[in-house]
Structure formats: structure tokens, C-alpha cells
A protein has these predicted regions:
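Short histidine-centered beta-strand/loop micro-motifs
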Residues: 50-55, 72-78, 95, 103-105, ...
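Double-stranded beta-helix
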Residues: 2-9, 121-177
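A short, N-terminal "cap"/entry segment at the start of jelly-roll beta-barrel domains
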Residues: 1-59, 164-177
Length: 177
């Protein structure tokens, strides 16, 4: 492999391109400021606006979430294991159908493996912008995201609807299913 081909496999931190409309909770207050990064593999974004840095299918996906303080990622699940690596900040992870089955606080350098099929969410509880790396198994990133029913209901109240195909429709922008 030549130098140019190898350099095409590098994603530099300063070149990361966020998507602020990646998921069904993009308009829900408290979750509407998060940024999603799809770094390697197709990821699980529900938005056609998501930029994929390296689209190779290599058996797993690497993504990231960037969030300002007090911004949360809504309760969701995946069909494959998900591992989080805290890159920056302080984070509260919570789990269960309503997010009240348990919680843990993590800091920079901590790694957390969340079992398949458990609803989980997370919130930046630090005072600065925080970032997590997420690793999902499988080329299809587990077939997408499975949202807790209350997340889908909250999103609909704020204009976002998720089709059975996994595509996100924004009624505020006049999109119809």
C-alpha cells in the first residue's frame, strides 16, 4: 500500500465533521445540541446529512458523540455490543426502560461496555464540551438504533418521525413520509 492510500485511512481530529440532525431526538430539548460523528463504517445515523469519514466495512463501526454540558443522549439500544471510551469530560451513563435501573459516572480515559439489548443514555455532566468514542460491532452497526418508546413520542411532539426503513423525517421542514 502506498503512502497516499494509507493516508486516506487517517481521520484527524481537526477534520471531524459533525452531524447535528443524526437522530430522532435532534429537536427534543435537552438532546438538541449533540453532535454525532461517523468515523469508520456506516454507523447508525438516521439522517442523510451524516458525513461518513471512512466507509470501509471492516466488521465494526467507530463513531463519536460530542455534547455541551447538560446535553443528553436519549435512551436507546442496539442489537450488538456497544463500547464507550471517554475522550473528554465527565459523563453520566444511565440505563433501563426509563433510565432508572442504574447509573455510573465516567471520566476521561474510562471505558464502558454496555450489553446488547439494554436501553442506555448518557449526559455530559462536566462544565465543558465533552466527547465520547463509541465502538459498535458488525458492519451494519447492529441494524441501527432501537429507541425507548417515550423517546419516539417526545420526538414526534417536536416534529421528527422515524420511518420503519430507519429514515428520519422532519415535519418542521415539510418532509412527509
Amino acid at each position: 500500500m502506498n503512502q497516499t492510500n494509507m493516508e486516506n485511512r487517517i481521520v484527524r481530529y481537526g477534520d471531524l465533521e459533525p452531524c447535528r440532525t443524526a437522530f430522532i431526538d435532534a429537536h427534543t430539548p435537552g438532546s438538541n445540541q449533540k453532535e454525532n460523528f461517523t468515523i469508520i463504517g456506516g454507523g447508525v445515523s438516521e439522517s442523510p446529512d451524516q458525513y461518513v469519514h471512512i466507509s470501509d466495512q471492516i466488521g465494526f463501526n467507530i463513531g463519536a458523540a460530542g455534547q455541551p454540558p447538560r446535553c443528553r443522549n436519549s435512551l436507546h439500544s442496539h442489537r450488538t455490543a456497544e463500547v464507550f471510551f471517554v475522550l473528554k469530560g465527565w459523563w453520566r451513563f444511565f440505563w433501563g426502560r426509563w433510565g432508572d435501573a442504574g447509573e455510573v459516572t465516567l471520566e476521561e480515559g474510562d471505558i464502558f461496555n454496555i450489553p446488547t439489548g439494554i436501553f442506555r443514555g448518557f449526559e455530559n455532566i462536566g462544565s465543558d464540551y465533552g466527547m465520547l468514542m463509541a465502538i459498535l460491532g458488525g458492519n451494519d452497526a447492529g441494524g441501527g438504533v432501537l429507541w425507548a418508546p417515550q423517546v419516539i413520542q417526545d420526538a414526534a411532539e417536536h416534529g421528527l418521525v422515524l420511518a420503519e426503513t430507519g429514515r428520519l423525517y422532519d415535519k418542521k421542514n415539510g418532509e412527509v413520509m
